[in-house]
Amino acid sequence: MFDKLLPKPIDNTYSGSKIALWLFGLIVFVHILQSVMVIVNGHSIAQSADGIPLENYPAAAAQTILAIFTVSALRRLIISLICAVALFRYRSAVPLMFVVLGLNYLGGQVIFQFIPIIRVGTPPGVVVNLIMFGLTIVGLALSLWRR
């Protein structure tokens, strides 16, 4: 199993389930779309998808929140683009990239336990990200499964 997570040659050889590749493609596409939407229209996305009440903060604080939010989206976009490269060119790294995506989500959730985000209502972004994490776990298991 560890040989599949950390393959000696990183090439286009892939022995996991084909369904895992489709799941990986879907997850990467959604992450890229989410990231670009935040970078292009962060104010609206922060309020609607993530339920962050920006109007409750002074203008300078809201701008700082948006800047941090957008930088986080840029980092997520970079990770997602690396995942896309793995999907199309270095498929032996797909299981490792599933782990990277999963740890990225889990790390964020741990941080939010100590520094919670104040949200209004039940924003859809939280649910979408939880579903994407579930698909990531399923995809990881399928990518490690020998055909």
Identify the role of each PLM range:
Residues 49-84:
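Core segments of alpha-helical transmembrane spans in multipass integral membrane proteins
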Residues 134-147:
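Membrane-water interface at the C-terminal end of transmembrane alpha helices
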